[in-house]
């Protein structure tokens, strides 16, 4: 396994697997980990992968900083009701697509 594997490197299309997960799968699940929305099993698999994959760990760190920045800049602001409703609908639609029939 390359020390530099991860989503931003030339071989990001490989399914580099650390901790039982490929880089693409880890990148797709980063926000569920940051938001505390993944299962304990998925959290452990993500943790193992991030410990072994510097590229994905860098990506995780970037997303973590973005989340913190958004949290500090948007504190107390409330989205307009129309936007909130559109987001709710999109989340439901995405959940249905990911969850399947």
Swiss-Prot record:
Protein name per its UniProtKB record: Anti-sigma factor RshA
NCBIfam families: antisig_RsrA
Domain of life: Bacteria
One GO BP: response to oxidative stress
Statement: the UniProt record of this protein carries the keyword Metal-binding: yes
Keywords: Iron, Iron-sulfur, Metal-binding, Phosphoprotein, Stress response, Transcription, Transcription regulation
InterPro entries per record: Anit_sigma_mycothiol_RsrA, Znf_put
Post-translational modification: Phosphorylated, probably by PknB. Phosphorylation decreases interaction with SigH, leading to increased SigH-mediated transcription.
């Amino acid at each position: 396994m390359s020390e530099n594997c991860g989503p931003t490197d030339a071989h990001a299309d490989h399914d580099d697997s650390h901790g039982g997960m490929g880089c693409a799968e880890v990148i797709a699940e980063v926000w569920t980990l940051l938001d505390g929305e993944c299962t304990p099993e998925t959290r452990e698999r993500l943790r193992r992968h991030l410990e072994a994959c510097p590229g994905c760990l860098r990506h995780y760190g970037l997303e973590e900083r973005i989340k913190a920045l958004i949290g500090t800049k948007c504190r107390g602001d409330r989205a307009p009701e129309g936007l909130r409703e559109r987001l709710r609908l999109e989340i439901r639609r995405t959940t249905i697509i990911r969850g399947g029939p």
